[in-house]
Design a protein with these regions (language model features):
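Basic, amphipathic alpha-helical/coil surface patches used to engage anionic, phosphate-bearing ligands
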Residues: 2-354
Length: 354
């Protein structure tokens, strides 16, 4: 996996069957490239670091929102505090969080101001209709999925909160029917998934120079791809429309051989910017991949880390010691009074003696 290779643009399907086949193969090749790359670099929200064109777009978006008579607020951040009813009050405080939120919508629409403006209005309308601001207080009946299917746990090396997703439990048919058996159950699950996302948003500062996005880790082991297609597409669409630029990096782990096929199905729902955030780890390479972004004491034990359920309730854990053993080196470790001898041969293979 190389962080320097940029994934190629998603292909545009041709109308002929031959062209469609080429399009599918291009999608599969695109997915294969993603197995080796992640080109995304998180953008700054500090005004002094923004180019003049982006500052102009931000000012134009604010001006458009200021024409709305009703207050607009997303994630608890007022976006048009100087709308017409309050325009005469020049002393009205300016919330610096508004710049962060509006820049997210602008980046999601490549700084096309009118498109970003429309996206803000649709998101605000959806949040009002969905009741997103109150969803954290709801009991949705998924206690048995907490800490298994979707949950916030720890943070990465840069302070981003980490959300883990694992849908392998739904290979059990009874579990699948209980959660996704009909439209009402699926709607309740989607509401619960939004609830988890809102927890992640609550953990962000949403301020220039602060932590303004989360990390998503998705475990594809045993994931029933066909059965979860409808739910996956709805979650992707809902999050892209209403949580723009909320994910700093998307890490897929335990990736099976058919991932390229799965990617070709979800690719039309993803922007190129979103796909540039992907990091892929096949089975057997999970811990090594996660350690690049998350310290071992914060990685769950099921993924090769040291963190167990409840470990973070009493504050941050004691940092783990990290080091690299080169070929031919001999290192002595002492773990809770037990001496461990670790040898590495010239090929880098390690042998541990207790």
């Amino acid at each position: 996996m190389s962080p320097t290779t940029t994934p190629p643009p998603a292909p545009v399907a041709a109308p002929t069957s031959k062209g469609a086949k080429r399009s599918l193969m291009s999608s599969l090749m695109d997915a294969t490239a993603l197995l080796r790359s992640s080109s995304f670099k998180e953008d700054s929200y500090v005004a002094a670091a923004l180019p003049a064109s982006e500052l102009r777009a931000l000012a134009d978006l604010k001006a458009l929102l200021a024409t709305h008579p009703d207050p607009i607020s997303i994630w608890g951040v007022p976006l048009n505090p100087r709308s017409p009813p309050a325009a005469a009050d020049d002393a009205a405080p300016v919330d610096e969080r508004a710049d962060v939120v509006l820049l997210k919508f602008l980046r999601a629409r490549d700084f096309r101001v009118r498109d970003a403006h429309a996206m803000v209005l649709r998101c605000a309308a959806w949040r009002a209709e969905f009741g997103a601001d109150a969803v954290l207080d709801e009991e949705l009946g998924f206690k048995d999925l907490e800490g298994i299917v979707a949950y916030m746990h720890g943070w990465d090396r840069d302070g981003h909160p980490v959300c883990y997703n694992a849908y392998g439990v739904f290979k059990d048919r009874d579990m699948y029917e209980r959660v996704f058996g009909d439209g009402d159950r699926l709607a309740r699950f989607l509401r619960w998934r939004v609830q988890v996302m809102e927890r992640g948003v609550r953990a962000l500062t949403l301020r220039p120079g602060g932590v303004n996005a989360i990390i998503q880790v998705t475990d594809l082991k045993d994931m029933p791809k066909r059965e979860l297609r409808a739910a996956s597409n709805q979650i992707l669409s809902l999050f892209q429309d209403n949580y723009p630029e909320m994910v700093a990096r998307k890490v897929f782990i335990n990736v099976p051989w058919y991932f390229s096929v799965l990617f070709s199905m979800i690719s039309p729902f993803l922007t190129e910017r979103t796909k540039s955030k992907f990091v892929i780890a096949r089975e057997g390479n999970v811990a090594e991949t996660l350690y690049k972004f998350i310290r071992p004491e914060l990685v769950p034990v099921q993924y090769g880390g040291l963190s167990r359920t409840g470990d973070l309730e009493n504050g941050p854990p004691k940092p783990a010691s990290e080091f690299t053993i080169k070929g031919g080196e001999k290192v002595f470790l002492e773990i809770d009074g037990i001496e461990v001898q670790t040898n590495a041969d010239s090929s880098g293979c390690k042998e541990t003696t207790w």
